[in-house]
Curated annotation (Swiss-Prot):
It is an enzyme of class 3 (hydrolase). GO terms for molecular function: metal ion binding; peptide deformylase activity. One of its GO terms (biological process) is co-translational protein modification. It comes from Corynebacterium efficiens (strain DSM 44549 / YS-314 / AJ 12310 / JCM 11189 / NBRC 100395). Its EC number is 3.5.1.88. Belongs to the polypeptide deformylase family. The keyword Hydrolase applies. The active site is at E136. It holds the Pfam family Pep_deformylase. It catalyses: N-terminal N-formyl-L-methionyl-[peptide] + H2O = N-terminal L-methionyl-[peptide] + formate. Its cofactor is Fe(2+). Removes the formyl group from the N-terminal Met of newly synthesized proteins. Requires at least a dipeptide for an efficient rate of reaction. N-terminal L-methionine is a prerequisite for activity but the enzyme has broad specificity at other positions. This is Peptide deformylase 1. Disulfide bonds: none annotated.
Length: 169
């Protein structure tokens, strides 16, 4: 398995919509394994395929450090909110180093998709896992969490980005 480079803010792949996965083959299994290694190496709780430069609809997550939390992957994810209750909390992104901001997400979502073999999977998630599902699916739609911020938070986040060493290389 391999730790891949995480694409950083400004890379066009991060604002591109990922393609539905139709081939459940060894290359998909390798991608998922590499994504787990990459996420763990970077210290993240989630990673979407386009964050490693691959436009395929798959993400991995690890919320196992939270009571009852899960670790897994989802191919071709689709989610819908359960109820209207929301949660607001600090959110960051491996593709936008040093930036975190208060972001509002649905508290509980129903997720469906497939596993690496094409088998259907589904779950209901709340809290951190719900936030992770929404964040990673946004990535697969080419949407960064900055777009979910209110204008003042977005302006502050962009100021941090513009002042960052990684942005000014």
């Amino acid at each position: 398995m391999t730790v891949r480079d995480v694409r950083i803010f400004g890379d066009p792949v991060l604002t591109s919509r990922a393609d539905e996965v139709v081939d459940f083959d060894e290359s998909l299994a390798t991608l998922i394994d590499d994504m787990f290694d990459t996420m763990e190496d970077a210290g993240g709780v989630g990673l979407a395929a386009n964050q490693v430069g691959v436009l395929r609809r798959v993400f991995v997550f690890d919320c196992s450090h939270v009571d009852g939390g899960l670790r897994g992957h989802v191919v071709n994810p689709v989610w819908e909110p359960i109820g209207e209750e929301t949660q607001t909390g600090k959110e960051g992104c491996l593709s936008i180093p040093d930036v975190s901001a208060e972001t509002t997400r649905y508290e509980t979502v129903k997720l469906s998709g497939q596993d690496r073999d094409g088998n259907p999977i589904g779950l209901v998630a709340s809290g951190l896992l719900s936030r992770c599902i929404q964040h990673e699916t946004d990535h697969l739609d080419g949407v960064l969490f900055l777009k979910r911020l209110d204008p003042a938070e977005r302006k502050a986040a962009m100021g941090v980005i513009r002042a960052s060493d990684w942005f000014n290389k």
